[in-house]
Amino acid sequence: MIRPQTRLKVADNTGAKEIMCIRLLGGSNRKYSNVGDIIVASVKSATPGGVVKKGEVVKAVIVRTKKGIARKDGTYIRFDDNAAVIIRDDKQPRGTRIFGPVARELRDKDFMKIISLAPEVL
């Protein structure tokens, strides 16, 4: 469950280390977002020489959350951190590598490039 002002780790190699959610896309009065949802975020910390700079406003897709995700077979999956991948307007990732596992729910939301780059899909 990600809401505005939530800080997330960045799970790609764009140079950003941490982002803060500014806005949840997909509804005017939306309170929370989960895995596979797109958010607008501000880069709070970044490495020198990266693709994105500190203070830049970016779009990102949530790939991991601490809140459990209920699946249709009755199981839950939950991760150790909240993480996102920075994307372009055409839903393609800006980075060329993804770090850490990602949730299988991204496949339903048509983020196939992120699924293929991820080292593990849970």
Curated annotation (Swiss-Prot):
One of its GO terms (cellular component) is cytosolic large ribosomal subunit. The keyword Transcription does not apply. Disulfide bonds: none annotated. Part of the 50S ribosomal subunit. Forms a cluster with proteins L3 and L19. In the 70S ribosome, L14 and L19 interact and together make contacts with the 16S rRNA in bridges B5 and B8. NCBIfam families: rplN_bact (TIGR01067). Binds to 23S rRNA. Forms part of two intersubunit bridges in the 70S ribosome. This is Large ribosomal subunit protein uL14.
